[in-house]
């Protein structure tokens, strides 16, 4: 253990939560975090808005009905990323460089494995889940297309969220927000290009979202590759450290399960709406997508 961590945390984007009055620092930390959460939720909302305005009600139903399914499948891993943030923050407070390195090494590999697990799960489970939910036949194929393309980007989504967890553990909630703003602009512009310019419909908004997620992942990885030690990413050091993984899961899994429970209720509601047909799904998607 050494105290070199505190000497390396003077960057302007980082908030030192260990010294000085807390109220202002909590606000400076929490407001960008809340804005980041809102921007991530808006990704699907932008997809819904574009297809609803430029494609039609069936496409709107196909995209909008997927929001609770996406939440259900990824919330557990979002909780694990919260656990990662908590344990790295704890090591920073203890000024334990070695444990920070071990935790970040573990986080890197967990992000990679969870991303590819979700990618495969999305390809295999998309049609069975949407069929089980009673998605109408005239919507089902487009809904499956959207969900499968969306889940091709899961490695990027996991890379961003776990990378953001590392930055947030350092007291930096601003740079993840800046990255999400850039990705949001990319997503919106590509949505319009692919839907209006290329006529790609539902597939177009899914591809646009995937590219935007790739942009956010690339940017956050570049930031972390340039961080000072012990926070720098090293691809050749990816390794699961059992103690760090256990701590991460102990904190993160309950948070993830809590998010999944909320998503399950949304899936049940969506299944009920599906029984009324495509027009009902489109109407509810336009109204309820912001709630998800």
What are these regions (language model features)?
Residues 33, 37, 49, 86, ...:
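Transmembrane alpha-helix boundary and packing residues in multipass membrane permease domains
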Residues 111, 166-189, 207-210:
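Alpha-helical transmembrane segments of multi-pass membrane transporters/permeases
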Residues 29, 33-37, 71, 111, ...:
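Residue-level signature of transmembrane alpha-helical cores of multipass secondary-active transporters
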Residues 43-44, 78-82, 122, 160-161, ...:
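Functionally critical, cavity-lining and gating residues within the transmembrane helices
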């Amino acid at each position: 253990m050494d105290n070199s961590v505190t000497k390396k945390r003077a960057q302007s984007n980082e908030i030192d939560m260990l010294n000085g009055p807390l109220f202002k620092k909590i606000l400076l930390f929490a407001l960008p975090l809340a804005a980041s959460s809102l921007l991530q939720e808006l990704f699907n909302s932008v997809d819904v808005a574009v297809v609803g305005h430029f494609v039609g009600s069936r496409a709107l139903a196909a995209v909008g009905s997927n929001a609770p399914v996406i939440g259900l499948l990824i919330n557990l891993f979002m909780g694990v990323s919260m656990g990662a943030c908590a344990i790295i923050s704890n090591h920073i407070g203890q000024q334990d460089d070695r444990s920070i390195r071990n935790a970040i090494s573990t986080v890197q590999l967990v992000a990679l494995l969870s991303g590819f697990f979700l990618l495969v799960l999305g390809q295999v489970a998309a049609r069975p889940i949407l069929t089980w939910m009673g998605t109408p036949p005239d919507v089902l194929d487009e809904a499956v297309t959207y969900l499968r393309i969306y889940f091709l980007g899961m490695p990027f989504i996991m890379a961003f969220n776990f990378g953001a967890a590392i930055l947030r553990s350092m007291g930096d909630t601003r740079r993840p927000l800046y990255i999400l703003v850039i990705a949001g602009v990319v997503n919106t512009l590509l949505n319009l290009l692919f839907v209006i310019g290329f006529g790609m419909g539902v597939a177009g908004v899914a591809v646009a979202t995937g590219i935007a997620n790739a942009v956010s992942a690339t940017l956050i990885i570049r930031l972390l590759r340039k961080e000072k030690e012990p926070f720098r990413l090293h691809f050749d050091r990816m390794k699961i450290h059992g103690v760090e993984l256990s701590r991460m899961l102990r904190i993160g899994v309950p948070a993830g399960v809590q998010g999944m429970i909320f998503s399950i209720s949304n899936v049940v509601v969506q299944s009920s709406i599906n029984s009324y047909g495509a027009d009902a799904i489109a109407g509810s998607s336009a109204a309820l997508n912001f709630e998800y």
